[in-house]
């Protein structure tokens, strides 16, 4: 997958990383990107797609790691890889080159669909603008980059002086929708699901929910009949001042908020992989009510090396009668990595009974049940250990006497990380 650190790349990762049929690799040209915190198999140091050596560098990675398919995760990359498919050592997952070329240009998209769908009015010059505000948009681009809503001619002239290639188009004030689609290798539109874009941040939809309506299915069929798609794609429409749905853009790739339909059972990235393998697929979507709200997610990387974890029970692993599921996730990560778990507690009741009620009785390699007044620090025997406790006093005592890292429950999130090797260039 390339570039693996984009929002699109991260959605592809979430779509494919748990499938047992797929070994997933992420690659990037940018040293600082979120992909390096996520991918178990991560490769950096690729040239940019504009570099003459990009294809050779990509082919080296493909051959070195036995890559079968390349999944593009950005519009510009999508077009570049489609243009260079014959020179690449593996197959690119995506639609044919001509479709990619049309979809990567708003002007070309509008020219193709103007005879059959409503598209935004384009103004060849500012003299032809009938009313303000208008939109200025790059011909190519995604996620709202370089888009300006301009209320006056003076402001429009300011932006056009900086970038004469911007398209001047009508402002559409209504609701906005994305329709997530999948077309199989036979050209059949197998799924089209609409979702309303309820909140936009930096051009990305961060709050969305599914919507029904035959009009969205009709639009999807019309677009699918005009362009040749293969695999995942989507299009966006927005209501005009009269409520008319107007085609904004089409993209033959994964969208970040496709996670909404993925959680209803439609995994667009996985469907596209199987379709690229010339496999027939079946789609079974759930119909319960759902909405998605996205926010920045933190991932951490530390230099900690440990073979033992000591953890407190009361108000730490179990709080107010409820299991701390975030902490349990970390403890099971330790189990997967062969780290030994020690429960260290002054619990006043039967520890076995409490763990049994919480269904945690077989989780720990050792249970140390201290009496009142006994110091937890004296029970910790290893130097390659961590200590987790809600009590600052307990953490301070352990840190000062044992010199090991100590964590409050809220800080355990920094310990949740992919067990990945060092990045390979």
PLM ranges: what are they?
Residues 284-373:
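Alpha-helical substrate-recognition element adjacent to the catalytic core
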Residues 1-93, 410:
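ATP-binding N-terminal substructure of ATP-dependent carboxylate-amine bond-forming enzymes
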Residues 230-242:
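A short glycine-rich, hydrophobically flanked beta-strand micro-motif that places a catalytic Asp/Glu
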Residues 99-174, 185-188, 214:
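Active-site nucleotide/adenylate-binding loops and adjacent lid/helix of ATP-dependent enzymes
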Residues 4, 312-314, 387-391:
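Acidic di-acidic motifs
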Residues 246, 254-311:
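Non-catalytic pre-domain segments flanking phosphatase-related domains
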Residues 169-228, 239, 251-277:
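ATP-dependent carboxylate/phosphate-activation module, predominantly the ATP-grasp catalytic core
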Residues 375-393, 398:
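Conserved Lys-Pro-Asp/Glu-containing loop-to-beta segment of HAD-superfamily phosphomonoesterases
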């Amino acid at each position: 997958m390339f570039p693996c650190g984009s929002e699109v790349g991260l959605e592809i990762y979430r779509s494919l990383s748990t499938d047992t049929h797929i070994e997933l690799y992420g690659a990037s040209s940018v040293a600082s990107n979120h992909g390096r915190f996520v991918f178990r198999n991560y490769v950096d140091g690729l040239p940019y797609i504009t570099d003459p050596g990009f294809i050779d560098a990509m082919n080296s990675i493909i051959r070195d790691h036995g890559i079968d398919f390349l999944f593009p995760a950005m519009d510009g990359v999508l077009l570049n890889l489609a243009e260079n498919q014959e020179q690449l050592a593996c197959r690119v997952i995506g639609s044919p080159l001509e479709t990619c070329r049309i979809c990567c240009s708003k002007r070309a998209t509008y020219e193709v669909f103007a005879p059959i769908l409503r598209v935004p009015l384009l103004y060849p010059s500012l003299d032809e603008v009938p009313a303000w505000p208008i939109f200025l948009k790059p011909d190519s681009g995604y996620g709202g980059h370089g888009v300006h809503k301009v209320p006056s001619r003076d402001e429009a002239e300011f932006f056009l002086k900086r970038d004469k290639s911007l398209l001047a188009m009508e402002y559409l004030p209504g609701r906005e929708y994305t329709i997530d689609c999948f077309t199989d290798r036979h050209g059949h539109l197998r799924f089209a699901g609409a979702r309303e874009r309820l909140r936009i941040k930096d051009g990305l939809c961060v709050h969305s929910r599914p919507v029904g309506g035959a009009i969205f299915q009709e639009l999807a069929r019309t677009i699918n009949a005009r362009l040749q798609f293969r695999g995942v794609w989507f299009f966006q429409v927005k209501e005009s001042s009269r409520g008319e749905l107007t085609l904004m853009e089409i993209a033959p790739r994964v969208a970040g908020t496709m996670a909404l339909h993925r959680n209803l059972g439609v995994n667009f990235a996985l469907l596209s992989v199987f379709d690229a393998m010339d496999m027939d697929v079946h789609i079974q979507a759930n119909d319960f009510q759902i909405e998605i709200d996205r926010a920045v997610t933190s991932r951490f990387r530390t230099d900690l090396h440990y073979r033992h974890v000591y953890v407190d029970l009361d108000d730490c692993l179990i709080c107010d009668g409820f299991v701390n599921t975030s902490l349990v996730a970390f403890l099971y990560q330790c189990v997967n990595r062969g780290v030994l778990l020690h429960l260290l507690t002054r619990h006043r009741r039967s520890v076995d009974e409490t763990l049994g009620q919480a269904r945690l009785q077989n989780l720990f390699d050792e249970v140390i049940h201290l009496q009142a007044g006994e110091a937890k620090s004296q029970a910790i025997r290893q130097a390659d250990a961590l200590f987790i406790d809600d009590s600052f006093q307990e953490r301070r005592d352990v840190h000062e006497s044992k010199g090991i890292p100590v964590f409050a429950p809220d800080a355990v999130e920094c310990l949740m990380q992919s067990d990945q090797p060092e990045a390979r260039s």
